[in-house]
Structures are given as C-alpha cells and as structure tokens.
C-alpha cells in the first residue's frame, strides 16, 4: 500500500494537480457529494472491556446541510452524552477508538437509549436530525455457531439475531448495521438482507474491500453497502475497483474514517 500511495503522489506531482484530483481522474466518479460522517461515540466489544457487546454505536447527523454543521452537531451530542452518562453514575472513560465505554447495566439496548437522550438534550430530533448506526463486529461474538452477547447472557443464531435487529430498528432510529453477522455466515447475511431491505447493511469483515468477495455478495444479495479500507486490499487501484463495482451495482460505499 505504501508503494501504491507513493506512486499516486508522484503521478499527481508530475501532472501538476492535487492528489484528490488525480484520484478522481482515475476513478471517474459519476457524481460528487459531500461526505456524511458516522461518529463512533460509544465503544464496546473488543474496543472496551466490560461495555456493550456491540463494538461501535454511532451517530449520523443526517439533518446537517454542510460537513461543518455535521461535525458541530456531533460535537454537541458527544458533550451531552458525557453529561447523560454522568447523570446515570456511569464512568466517562473512553475505549480504544475514543468513544465513551461505560459498563452498561441493562444490555445493549440501553446504550441506544442513552444516545437518544443525548441527542434530545442537545436539541435535535432523533430520526430527523440525527440517526444511529452500529458496528456489531459479529465475527468476534461468534462461537460454536452462536452469537454470544455476554452482557445480556444471551445466545443467538443468525435468524434470532436478525429478529433482534428488526426489533431494535423499529424501536430506535438505527439506519445502518455493519458486520451484523459473522464474515462467513453467507446464508445468514442473505436472510438478514431479505429481512431488512431498507436498512444499510455494511460489510467490513465480510468483504475486506475485496472485489471477489464483493461480487459474490452482490450476486447472492448478502448486503447492500461496503466499508472501504485501502489497507485491507493493499493498493489504491484495487480500492478504486471495489468502489466502482459497488456503485455500479447500486451499493453504498463508506470510506473508513
């Protein structure tokens, strides 16, 4: 990857253009749009011992009209989340990725409730101004053909976990689920996609920015969005190919940030 990026920098310099313009010339995007950040404000799973089973609980400022406003809204909510946690006697220590990592007492759903409270306290409307997203990192929870939610002392198979997701998205404004099932649970992913057709279902561990795995997922209706990480596939060219393949098939692309 280092060599690939160095070549891209050198090519941009030799052409006398900025790097992002050089990459755009290679990728030939069909449309231009401002990025919508997804901010990891509650850490769990492998990123925070003793917190939620879900690895990342995120906020998405969907009502923002500019990137600057999106960051401002998110910062306000993050500050309110700290006050919300303190008000409930939870610690405000942080996990590996900078989000709060409280020892939630009543399971994963309580974390979503805390986020809604923080959003409202910041003066925003959940589901209108700000929505939620999760990175379950389900491969880390998968043992002996079951998904183990230790904080709730529960075990799920792919079907019952899908039902739990359905319940959560009807109760909370969750619009995106990343790695909701294990990376090789292809049948489970197909069922998840069929069950939640309006939810963004993101493959990270499932797809690893690999066009072969992405093509298989597309052909088998196993997800509808891909997380893009150049370090997973190893070159800028292969990264661009993955983005192009996803967009050509109507998938959303999320550049890891």
Q: Language-model segments: which ranges?
A:
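Active-site-proximal beta-alpha loop/turn segments in soluble metabolic enzymes
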Residues: 56-67, 91-108, 137-152
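Mobile "lid/hinge" segments at catalytic clefts and subdomain interfaces of large enzymes
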Residues: 28, 32-95
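Hydrophobic alpha-helical packing residues
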Residues: 7, 74-81, 85, 115, ...
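Short glycine/serine/threonine/alanine-rich loop segments
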Residues: 17, 90, 251
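Generic structural signal for well-ordered, non-membrane alpha-helical segments
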Residues: 4, 12-15, 67-74, 78, ...
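Hydrophobic alpha-helical hairpins/lids featuring a short glycine-rich hinge
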Residues: 1-43, 47
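Catalytic core of soluble alpha/beta enzymes
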Residues: 109-257
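Anion (oxyanion) recognition and catalysis
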Residues: 13-16, 86, 247
């Amino acid at each position: 990857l280092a060599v690939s990026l160095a070549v891209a920098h050198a090519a941009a310099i030799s052409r006398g253009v900025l790097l992002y313009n050089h990459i755009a010339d290679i990728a030939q995007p069909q449309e231009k749009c401002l990025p919508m950040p997804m901010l990891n404000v509650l850490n769990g799973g492998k990123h925070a011992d003793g917190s939620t089973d879900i690895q990342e609980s995120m906020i998405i400022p969907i009502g923002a009209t500019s990137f600057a406003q999106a960051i401002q809204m998110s910062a306000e909510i993050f500050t309110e989340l700290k006050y919300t946690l303190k008000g409930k006697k939870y610690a405000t220590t942080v996990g590996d990725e900078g989000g709060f990592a409280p020892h939630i007492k009543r399971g994963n759903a309580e974390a979503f409730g805390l986020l809604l409270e923080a959003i409202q306290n910041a003066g925003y409307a959940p589901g209108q101004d700000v929505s939620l997203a999760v990175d379950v990192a389900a491969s880390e929870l998968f043992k002996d053909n079951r998904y183990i939610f230790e904080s709730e002392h529960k075990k799920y198979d792919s079907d019952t976990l899908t039902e739990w997701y359905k319940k959560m998205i009807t109760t909370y404004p969750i619009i995106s689920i990343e790695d909701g099932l294990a990376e090789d649970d292809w049948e489970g992913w197909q069922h998840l996609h069929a069950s939640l057709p309006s939810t963004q279902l993101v493959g990270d561990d499932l797809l690893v920015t690999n066009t072969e795995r992405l093509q298989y997922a597309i052909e088998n209706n196993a997800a509808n969005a891909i997380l893009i990480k150049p370090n997973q596939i190893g070159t800028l060219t292969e990264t661009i190919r993955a983005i192009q393949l996803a967009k050509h098939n109507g998938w959303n692309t999320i550049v890891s940030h």
